[in-house]
């Protein structure tokens, strides 16, 4: 025995109170830091870190405005244009505007009207009419709003039954400043190795941003609570729904937090009941639950201590740690009870020593191999998935330490209980498996081959195309709000098409003299201007002139005609609106440039700035895509748009940029396929190597990998057959499945090897293994599968998938390791004859 082993047994067996005091102190320390634990469901946590489209998205967001606004749909019981409804909308709008972080609230009461009655350009310079203006003709206003190319399906539904309010938040300059600092250093890191000073700067910048981001999310969550409280005061007379990215972020965090608390406690209670039924002694319930709690507290505290937020992807890490810790506990408890039944007169401490000695090696390799399975996620290239891999690596390490430090130290202090080893239902089940596979070994093999073929076919049906709306149940506000906005307000998910001027345009242009034209056309407003200063944009801009505007119109009509797109806005929309004022002005470049210069600033901010750069050389088409469309194929849609603009409309490829959250999310989904293939390849190679080290037998290592491959492929195959898409949550299922299957495989092979040495009879060794280690495997699988079935009650669909698929993967791992693996061992005889 090594000096390290002697020291370990000295601490556990002779100084258990000191060991417990030390461990308790550490757990309390981390429990204190758990107060800093936080969740992060922001869009920044759900995108590819080195995505060039993300960099471009942030540039466009800074130039044209952010997607981070709230959208309130308002469906009144009375007529939308009645005085009482307009009064209620005004009161609601004013209350929302009083929120400190709100910059503005845009409603149908605030937008400029130009046909109610018809006005001239000079009228607009003097006064802009709105729905509340005394001069406004209410009948004409109704017609204008319902038929406006700008407002219809943006602020009012086409049937006039519903309106929408856009709540714009003030830009948090500090947040964006810290974000930019961090991103600049991250980008530099991708280009070249950072110097020590730069690494420190990146560390500080990341820490500062994380801290500020946490407070920013907390404020945003409070704002949304305030908005909902204000909305509740107006629900008597109208149906209201809340939408927008900030709301989705906040509600996702609430769902995750709810699942962590409610279902975490529910799973815990269910596991306690199941352990009580199985082991029928209080100590075998209390000890494993204390160890599971200690592991969870340590990990939550550690994440809080290092300010490492949990995302939608990694939100199930506590559940997984519970699985892994409990699995280790069950194997130790079953082994102790076996030894107690065999060595009835043995000393309590000696039984614990034997329990540890016989289980430390397989448990160590189980933990190590499971770590390898989760560490494989690090190669995915997706930040939240990478973080999840690291979290599980640290968490599994802690679970192993807790299992072999806290559990035996507590067990030593308890007086031994007498127990005779007797058969039970579990023994009958595992014995039945052993007898059945001996009689029907060929049928077992054929069955698994059929399952494998079906799994491969199912895997070929796997898709990454999924709808964000499918994350939520139909009765949730997010789901209902998205459906309503899709049906009545022209789509949910933002997509921008940005088109630059061609590269060869940026050269000095001849200024076209426009003298003598002033006498030919009366604009109806004062032309006190300097021609050199004011008559410039149509002559210097590539797009904002009548040579190019028909092309812009054609692009707009193409985008608007796509079945996947709802509301499309562009400079073409704005010019259609202005054309109703004076078509001659819009059709003449010189006067169009004057119009652009002289139009009031609030009109310019509404009609020009969101859709065209200041120099007129870049266009932005804002599109809302129908998120609830079951036929939505993001990648195909983006490729179709790009192909049409380049191949059919003659634009250069470098001119066309697609951006927005739809593009970023699509990039993430597409990378999932690549990372899934890469992840599984890496993990199986690594596990094969770990098996070889653990078993020191290449043939046994190759046999042992088979149940793991089948378990993982079956789960992925089921996902394919059931049309469950690969997304940012379900990508981790394969790694989870492999990690769980590895646990069973290593314990079974180690026990089989021990039993085989007794008489070198393969089938007898298998029967003894089934009746010993098979029991522990069965207990673990049944307990955790039933426990995690509670997650099926969640409102968050990814949590439901996680609970059910995890349970299914455990059952498949158990079946493969208790049936197929023994058959392969007997057939191929890895230990010789």
Residues of each region from the PLM?
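Signature of alpha-helical transmembrane segments and their immediate interfacial
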Residues: 1-41, 404, 408-409, 413, ...
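Alpha-helical transmembrane segments of multi-pass inner-membrane proteins
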Residues: 18, 262, 266, 314, ...
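Extracytoplasmic
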Residues: 58, 62, 135-277, 281-282, ...
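Interfacial segments of transmembrane alpha-helices in multi-pass membrane proteins
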Residues: 257-310, 379-383, 678-723, 793-797
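Hydrophobic, glycine/alanine-rich multi-pass transmembrane helices and their short helix-loop junctions
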Residues: 274, 303, 364-406, 411-412, ...
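Helix-loop junctions and hydrophobic alpha-helical segments within the transmembrane domains
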Residues: 339-368, 756-779
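Juxtamembrane segments of multi-pass membrane proteins
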Residues: 440-589
